[in-house]
Regions:
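Acidic/histidine-rich catalytic neighborhood of metal-dependent amide-processing enzymes
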Residues: 107-183
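A structural signal for isolated positions on well-ordered beta-strands in alpha/beta enzyme cores
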Residues: 42, 69, 133-135, 290
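Glycine/serine-rich anion-binding loops at beta->alpha junctions
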Residues: 97-113, 200
């Protein structure tokens, strides 16, 4: 049965300690599997420093169009506190309906379903009217500078064209199949340093306390009403994530205070426009400050195409519920892929991602396999 193949493949993938940005042999293993099934495999390593070196795999079966691509990342976040796990995080454990292991949800489970669905499809239809491909990286959970982005640039220079991508990020909220992502919010990180004047707490008139201004500015920032959301996006949101003064001395007013905050923004904005709004709010306060920002992603949303409608129908047929077309969640490699290919993000439930005792359900793996397999039938059978 297919689920047994999925579990066998997933067990092997989980056994690789592929903590970002290291493949630890996992992509090489996948390449061998796919090569044996007739895929042409291309492995590229990007990054100059040892700690940057990232393994990327592009595998393709066939030369025709459309090219249906299973995209994803084999890297996982560290398990941390392994002593708090009930089982070895890098050894798949099946207990009843639950399947435990680091990456089962995010996102080795989806990769296993994609691999098995492709191999089983090709056993029945060895000459599809199109191509099947895989685009996999070991650098998504980290900086993502040496993974999917440069691999896509490399493939474009070679003339490779991907027509439709399925990115197996965990998307389900309450039930399998309840959400399909066709876009993502943008993200921009800020570091604000407010400069005061150090002094003795007993003589505050000789000092300028930066904390006083920092608290007022933080309040104003959190009260910014950026927008009311848009058709596919929720309201833009700002969260203060750190407030530091670096002062452990009880009788000193510190020299400076540092605020760090993140803004997740919709398609009304860009990172630059968000910076302008933030700067305007801070500038209303009479303080000396330094403001730096860095964006990891701009927002994007794609046109809801015919292929996306067909994919939605496949999901609904499997789950028996109409999926929500969504753009929420964290950043993903879809921010790179959508520039080269139509893309949907669809995978398992995100509520277990990055958690201790990360796990998924056997029934969800079976359902995901069915969706992926039926997608190949839909898009590649004339």
């Amino acid at each position: 049965m297919a689920i047994e193949q999925v579990l066998e493949t997933l067990a092997k993938l989980v056994s690789f300690r592929s903590v970002t940005p290291y493949s630890s042999g996992s992509l090489e293993y996948i390449a061998k599997l796919l090569t044996n099934a007739g895929f042409s495999c291309d492995i590229q390593v990007f990054g100059e420093k040892e700690e940057e070196k990232t393994t990327n795999l592009y595998a393709r079966y066939g030369n025709g169009s459309p090219n249906i691509c299973f995209a994803g990342h084999i890297d996982v976040v560290p398990p941390l506190n392994e002593n708090l796990w009930d089982y070895n995080p890098f050894e798949l454990k099946v207990i009843g309906e639950k399947v435990y292991g680091r990456g089962t949800v995010d996102m080795k489970g989806a990769i296993a379903c994609g691999i098995v669905s492709a191999l089983n499809y090709l056993k029945i239809y060895p000459s599809p009217s199109g191509s099947i491909s895989f685009l996999l990286t070991s650098d998504e959970e980290g900086c993502a500078k040496f993974g999917t982005k440069p691999m896509l640039e490399y493939l474009a220079k070679k003339g490779e064209k991907i027509d439709f991508s399925i990115l197996g990020e965990p998307t389900a909220r309450a039930h399998f199949g309840d959400t399909i992502a066709i876009g993502r919010r943008g993200s921009v990180n800020f570091v604000l340093k407010i400069i005061g004047k150090q002094g003795h707490v007993a003589y505050p008139h000789t000092a300028i306390n930066p904390i006083t201004s920092a608290v007022k500015i933080a309040t104003d920032l959190m009260n910014i009403d950026f927008d009311n959301g848009s058709e596919f996006f929720e309201k833009t949101n700002l969260e203060v994530i750190s407030f530091d003064v670096g002062n452990n001395v009880v009788n000193i007013i510190p020299e400076q205070a540092t605020l760090k905050f993140n803004v997740r923004f919709n398609d009304f904005h860009s990172a630059k426009s968000i910076f302008g709004i933030v700067l305007e709010v801070i500038s209303k306060h009479e303080v000396i400050f330094d403001l730096q920002y860095e964006s990891s992603a701009e927002s994007f949303v794609q046109k809801y195409s015919e292929k996306m409608k067909k994919f939605t129908a496949i999901v609904q047929n499997q789950s028996q519920i109409p999926p929500k077309i969504d753009t929420n969640g964290g950043t993903s490699d879809a921010r790179f892929i959508h520039k080269y290919s139509e893309i949907v993000e669809f995978g398992l439930s995100f509520d277990q991602a990055h958690k201790i005792n990360e796990h998924t359900q056997i029934s969800d793996l079976q359902s995901l396999y069915n969706v992926y397999y039926n997608s190949l039938v839909e898009f590649l059978q004339k």
